[in-house]
Amino acid sequence: HLFEKLGVASDLTGRHKVGQGTVVFEKSSPSRLSRSDRGGELVRTAVKEAMSETGQTWKESPALVLRRGPYIVAAGLDFAGETTPVTLKGRFIPLFDAAQPVVHEYAVGVGARGLLVDLNRFPSDHIGVVAAACRVSNEKVTNQSVTFDAIGQADTNAVVSLLLPHAPKVVTIDSKALEADAVEFKDGILRLRFPNRAERIRVAVSR
């Protein structure tokens, strides 16, 4: 099906120009390549050849950084040795940090593991939840408010981060005002903290 969409023969092998890119296909089992001493080199060679066709340069890195939508998965290779860590720059919320801070640099060193929200991937006028240490559902954004339901494991703390252009007028949990020290607004991020419950909690942010 993929070859059909690309407009090439189904028995295609080798390297072929397709549109503005290059397709490389080798009839080798990925599982077999993973067990072969030469498997890694065969894959690297194929990728380098494809990149050369489009004027790209092969560059090795001591880290793997994958992006999907606003999310970044980052891992430092355990065998990277004394290499300089890869540093991501921007505006991120590291989801493995319970405090959900906003950081502008994130170092991916040897053995590091990170799951980040890239705030710069959201439209400049985006309003709403971008990270949460609970399950968020039924979110609704209007000119007057942001409302959503939250549910989580009992006896744990919920932390919810929202993009908001201005500090909120008031935040309520099940119609009761959230205490001031549980509400933090800085640099366009509203951070809420409240006890999780294993039942629906209604959160309302008045704008």
Regions found by a protein language model. Name each.
Residues 106-110, 182-186, 193-197:
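Short proline/glycine- and polar residue-rich coil/turn motifs
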Residues 189-207:
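Surface-exposed interaction regions enriched in Ser/Thr/Asp/Glu
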Residues 89-98, 162-177:
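Solvent-exposed beta-hairpin/edge-strand motifs
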Residues 137-162, 200:
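Beta-strand-rich recognition domains
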Residues 78-90, 151-167:
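Surface-exposed beta-strand/loop patches in extracellular or lumenal glycoproteins
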Residues 74, 148, 171:
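Hydrophobic, well-ordered secondary-structure elements that form the walls
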Residues 1-143:
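A conserved amphipathic helix/loop scaffold
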Residues 104-106, 137, 148-150, 190-194:
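Beta-strand-rich interaction surfaces with strong enrichment in secreted/lumenal proteins
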